[in-house]
Structure formats: C-alpha cells, structure tokens
Amino acid sequence: MKVISSIQELRDQLRGQNRTAFVPTMGNLHEGHLSLMRLARQHGDPVVASIFVNRLQFGPNEDFDKYPRTLQDDIEKLQKENVYVLFAPTERDMYPEPQEYRVLPPDDLGGILEGEFRPGFFAGVCTVVTKLMSCVQPRVAVFGKKDYQQLMIVRRMCQQLALPVDIIAAETVRDEDGLALSSRNRYLTTDERKEAPELAKTLQRVRDGVLGGERDLGKLEQTARAHLAERGWAPDYISIRRRANLIAPSAAELEAGEPLVVLAAAKLGATRLIDNLEI
C-alpha cells in the first residue's frame, strides 16, 4: 500500500485507473470503516482510502483539536485490507490557501436535523468530498448509513453536479450490545459506555411503534426523547422521516407504507452520539 499526501502524486499514481473505488474517512479506523473497504472492493478496483480530519466541518466549539488521530495504527489496518493507496494529506496539502469556495447543500436537506444543530457542517462535508473526488476521480465511493443524512446529501450532490461517481451505501456496523461503531465512542467514560446502547434500543422502540400501527409520530418521538432525558441524556432530536428525502411523512404516506427512517442525536455526558434505523 502506498501512502501519499500530495495531490499531484496521487493523480500520477492513479492515472489510467477507471474502476477506482474510494472510501473517504477521518481516520481512527474501526471495524465499521474496514467494512466499507471490503464493500468497496466488491464494486471496484483498486480501492483507495483517504484520511483527513477536515477542519471545515467542525464548529468553533466542537472537537477538531481532540479528534483522535491514529495514522500509524490506521495504516496497519488498511494494509491488512489490501487497500491500494491511502491518501493522507496534511491541511496544507488540501487547503494550501484559504478555502473561499464552498459547496452548499440545499436547506431542505442540509439545514435540518444535523444541519440545524451543526450549522456549516454539511457545507464543510460537501466541500471536502467534492475536492477529494476531484483528486481521486473514483468510479464508485462508499459511505456508511451510520451518517444517514450525510449519505443522502453526498448522493444528491453527485447527481446534481453530474459527478461521474456512484455512491454505495454501507450498512451500520454495531457492537454486540447494539451501539453503532463510531470514532467518538472512545470519548465515553466506562459508565457512559454501559449506557450508550440505550440510544439504539430507543430507536428500536420507535420503529416497533410505527410497525405496530401507531400513527401519532409526534407522540412516539416525544416519548423517546423523554425516555432518554430521564436516563441522563440530552437529546437534540429523534425524528421519523421519509427515506427518500428526509421530509416528515404525511398521513397518506404512512398509510401507503412509505419507507421511513428514524434518526437521532443525543449527548451522553460530553459525547454527542448519532444513530438511525430504517423502518
């Protein structure tokens, strides 16, 4: 596996490749990330991964400085997955001058849910993903359903900008107790880690309620938020949306069996966790 930080060197290395499968990450790799590499290999060759902690998608009071950076461990994991190239640029490589041009998602998708609580987050994501796509020029790229809204925004962005990249969705990987794998799980204290699976269990109860015939979605959402709050969480949102566009479903759509997803974000102590379940 070649480890490359220069954009020009990356382009030289990949010249002539027309089936490249790309997996962008911020590093601190876990089994969830590695499952993305394996899925990428099913859809293209060679597999290219990137590791870049993107300052543009962090707010002023978020965890950019303390976000875990474990490059040497990550390299060893990617070598075992037979990744062809790891693109690991420095901030100067990616942004040699201030990044004044941004890619802004539409408010109907980028300004809701995560976008409401993390202003500017998706503009940062879209900007860096577009730039990474320009560098790697993949045929396919793999994104996890763990970040459901991000997946949808990136897919729509590629469609609307006519980027010749197919976006592949990967299922969320969970620990044995149901907690969705995340690099931020390492922030949890021992007691918080024991409590953390309650987020997934709460989403399961919401899903069961919908599948059981409950049509008052607001009641399901409020009950779920109250349940987490009683256990010491600080919920940002628990919301049932259409899978197609993350808009709240109408009564007619509910009766017609519209495919849904329930999404959540909540703080446990100082750690903000997100999760979702398709219904």
Curated annotation (Swiss-Prot):
Homodimer. This is Pantothenate synthetase. Beta-alanine binds at residue 57. SUPFAM superfamilies: Nucleotidylyl transferase. GO terms for cellular component: cytosol. Keywords: ATP-binding, Cytoplasm, Ligase, Nucleotide-binding, Pantothenate biosynthesis. Pathway: Cofactor biosynthesis; (R)-pantothenate biosynthesis; (R)-pantothenate from (R)-pantoate and beta-alanine: step 1/1. It holds the Pfam family Pantoate_ligase. The active site is at residue 33. It comes from Burkholderia ambifaria (strain ATCC BAA-244 / DSM 16087 / CCUG 44356 / LMG 19182 / AMMD). One of its GO terms (molecular function) is ATP binding. ATP binds at residues 26-33, 144-147, 173, 181-184.
